[in-house]
């Protein structure tokens, strides 16, 4: 088979760091609820999350292989990075989008409000999973 990626430092030990973060806001009126959702959607859109994740991958010493991002209607966003320990061969081909050298970083947002209650909520799920020599725990320093 051509175009195989060379694995190095592979140790079959997956290291994962996951966060589930919640923000609950008292929003008495429909206008306040929608204003909160608009604010969250602007602050945590896929472009902004991508920039934050670029910084995160630099912190753990990973190189980004591929980025997939999506904003949702009416609200919410998802971003996934495939990562490697070091830069790979340039122009590996489209198959690199489905396969990875070391692992992934994902962020998913879930802003919502309850129309019959005075609540607006925001949940973000962050998952960093690696194998090999890089570790997500270095982001905690």
Where are these regions (language model features)?
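Polybasic/polar functional segments that serve as interface/processing modules
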Residues: 1-141
